[in-house]
Design a protein with these regions (language model features):
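Acidic, polar-rich low-complexity tracts and alpha-helical solenoid repeat scaffolds
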Residues: 2-4, 22-132
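Sec-dependent bacterial lipoprotein signal peptides
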Residues: 1-23
Length: 132
């Protein structure tokens, strides 16, 4: 009886360990020529599945491949910061939102999508309230 219990326990530990390992995400292969909107869609699909590390890789691809598409850059920066917030990585989230808000202090801020400024300010305010 005792031996059966030990084997059941070891089996349960192995099952849990395999589940944890399977949740770790490998680098995503992102094809060349994929548009920023396709990257956003893939990132959103990954986020919907709670595959946050995969989503961040897609958003990072926007930052790497399309640095001159300021609207997509703002989208990616906001979404990465928001994912960090959802993961309770508040220091990283705050840094991301703060860096994004710095863009809105520059001379060409009028060309930036307003929604990310508003949303970033709201999340930062919520984070401050949660600290109290």
């Amino acid at each position: 009886m005792r031996r059966t219990t030990v084997w059941l326990f070891l089996g349960a530990v192995l099952l849990v360990a395999s589940q944890l390992v399977s949740c770790a995400s490998a680098p995503v292969v992102i094809p060349d020529g994929i548009t920023p909107m396709e990257l956003v869609q893939r990132a959103q699909d990954a986020t919907d599945k709670n595959q946050y590390d995969v989503a961040i890789q897609y958003y990072q691809a926007i930052l790497d491949r399309y640095p001159d598409d300021i609207e997509m850059v703002c989208t990616a920066e906001y979404e990465i910061a928001f994912i960090k917030y959802k993961q309770h990585k508040y220091t990283e989230a705050k840094a991301g939102f703060t860096a994004l808000l710095e863009r809105y202090k520059e001379a060409d801020a009028e060309f930036l999508p307003a929604q990310y400024k508003i949303l970033s300010e709201k999340v930062l305010a919520k984070m401050e309230l949660e600290k109290k």
